[in-house]
UniProtKB/Swiss-Prot annotation:
Transmembrane parts of this sequence: none
Region of interest called G4, as start-end residue ranges on this chain: 136-139
Name of the gene encoding the protein in the UniProt record: tuf1
Cystine connections: none
The protein's name in its UniProt record: Elongation factor Tu
Amino acid sequence: MAKEKFERNKPHVNVGTIGHVDHGKTTLTAALTRVCAEVWGGNAVAFDGIDNAPEERERGITIATSHVEYDSPTRHYAHVDCPGHADYVKNMITGAAQMDGAILVCSAADGPMPQTREHILLSRQVGVPYIVVFLNKADMVDDEELLELVEMEVRELLSDYDFPGDDTPIIKGSALKALEGDTSDIGMPAVQKLVETLDEYIPEPERAVDQPFLMPIEDVFSISGRGTVVTGRVERGIVKVGEEIEIVGIHDTTKTTCTGVEMFRKLLDEGRAGENVGVLLRGTKRDEVERGQVLAKPGSINPHTKFVAEVYVLSKDEGGRHTPFFNGYRPQFYFRTTDVTGACTLPEGTEMVMPGDNVQMDVELIAPIAMEDGLRFAIREGGRTVGAGVVAKITE
């Protein structure tokens, strides 16, 4: 039992299974935990323990998600699996489970199906950077040519959505056989090969602290004789005393200098990702900065008003709208710490959007917000959340 000892200093990578219903996502998830436990140590999780996914509430949205963990020799993986298609849509749009890479499970017996396509599209929209394919149920296909045909179809589908289809790793196997302990090529070795492929193909994610500094502003105070202090939680990067920073969003971008960082009334020489701090700004007046703006490393983020969004509209049961909305709908968009009104343009041919739907739409805000692709937001009406979305692509 010597291999039970976990190394907690390994890099953490977040992954998840995506793909059409009944193509074997949950079976593969269980097989991954079993194979990793047997080969490299750790704990296996049974199929039932994953399939009965607990419901969680993320921004008021009910999402059923299973979380499992497994280890390769060099990494610790946190893996999400969802029981239903609607759960995937909600999960990916809210960013409840941000993925560094996804495992697309496709049945070799059926080939790509509607949700295969939809999950690839969602991955593109919400910014999942890498996809690895597991061609499942390979034991049910005797004809090698048929396997190759399905592989080609999957590669074409990935390329359709700007993933590198020709270079995407595809592993053929049987998740069920692997889960049963089968040691033939398509059983446990195929799943082991999948994990080794994740190790090689998905790069180690950059830690928040190594990214360019960004802090959403929550509050603004003026301290007599010292100047203006803004408070908030540092989202990423580090701000050091003496560094030049920009104030971005709502108004024209301005430059200032950080002349002090405080945490719990103690003076620090820097504020780091994850910390709640007060930042003292040189020469900035109390009325020149407000909640909803961000402090950022100069040049690292710009303000925008127009973008394409992928949106999930809450159902009535989730406390959302009871009625559909139409083209020209003008709700508030809640970014980080503030609401901004925006107008929605629906895709051509879409008359209306019903509660419980997901939709791609064009949005134009009445004031610019510091944004980049992948930024999450809530849609609100009078302070009540009626939707969740992600910036798929900035247009202006």
